[in-house]
Every structure is written in C-alpha cells, then in structure tokens.
C-alpha cells in the first residue's frame, strides 16, 4: 500500500531556513530534477527548500513536492501560493490549554485519569493536515 520511494539523501538544517536553502542547493546540484519529494521537519526548512528551488531557476512545474510541519503563518502562505503541497498544523493553543489544565490538576492534587496520559507522562495533541483546500481556515486562526 502507498507509493514506493527511493531515499536519495537527507540533510540536517537545524530548523533554519537559510541552512535549508544551502543544503537544498547542494542536493539539487547532485540530483537535479530527480528529487520528487522534500519532507521538512518544520515550515522554516521547507521554505528554505522553496527558496533554493526558486534561486536555482528550476521551473515551478518541475519542482518536487514540498511538505512542511508546524503550520506557521509563513508556511500557510506557501501552501496558499501553491509552493508547498501542505503542512501539518501544530496547535499551540490546545497544547497550552492542556498544560494549564494539567498544572491546575497537579496543584490541586486531583486525579489525572481524565488526561489519558501516554506512558503516564505525555499528552498528545493531534496535528492537523493543512492543504490548499483548508489553508484559509488555518490562516484565520492566526489572525
């Protein structure tokens, strides 16, 4: 099931747009248009990859699919412009609410059963897929 991919390479860009741009240019010089997909662990690095694609003059229709994570305003704008196929929204508000609720429960020495802690320690706040179809909804959340 799914699509079989060959991993051509990887690069570490330390969550940094500029480093991601440099690393992507290096990968493009090595693999040219054989790169079909760029998965970045945050939107900043995805945007750095987009910057490299733009600066190297590759025609947009030849770009690989670019996906980021975090759903930052800049990342959402890249999705809206069609430069990234998607990002994954990291809901900081839900995370903050969960931390506050947990802190209050701990301070009051209340049961933590309702928090459904994973491994007795973690609260999972699900990420949300953002694509061109729903990007405007997420941009509104950031206003």
PLM region spans:
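Hinge/beta->alpha junction and helix N-cap segments in small-molecule ligand-binding domains
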Residues: 1-23, 39-45, 69-74, 90-98
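Residue-level recognition of the N-termini of beta-strands and the immediately preceding loop/turn
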Residues: 5-8, 34-37, 62-65, 120
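Short helix-capping segments at alpha-helix termini
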Residues: 1-4, 30-33, 54-62
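Hinge/cleft segment of the Venus flytrap/periplasmic-binding protein
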Residues: 97-143
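Venus flytrap/periplasmic-binding-protein-like
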Residues: 39-42, 47-85
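Short, well-structured alpha-helical segments in soluble
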Residues: 18-34
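Extracellular/periplasmic ligand-binding modules, especially the Venus flytrap/periplasmic-binding
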Residues: 42-50, 80, 92-108, 128
């Amino acid at each position: 099931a799914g699509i079989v991919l060959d991993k051509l390479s990887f690069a570490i860009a330390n969550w940094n747009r500029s480093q991601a741009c440099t690393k992507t240019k290096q990968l493009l010089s090595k693999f040219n248009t054989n790169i079909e997909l760029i998965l970045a662990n945050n939107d900043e690095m995805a945007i750095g990859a987009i910057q490299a694609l733009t600066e190297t003059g590759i025609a947009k229709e030849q770009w690989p699919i670019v996906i980021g994570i975090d759903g930052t305003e800049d990342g959402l704008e890249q999705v809206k412009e069609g430069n990234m196929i998607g990002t994954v929204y990291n809901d900081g508000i839900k995370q903050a609410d969960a931390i506050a609720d947990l802190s209050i429960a701990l301070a009051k020495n209340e049961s933590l059963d309702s928090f459904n802690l994973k491994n007795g320690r973690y609260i999972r706040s699900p990420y949300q897929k953002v694509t061109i179809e729903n990007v405007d909804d997420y941009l509104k959340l950031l206003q």
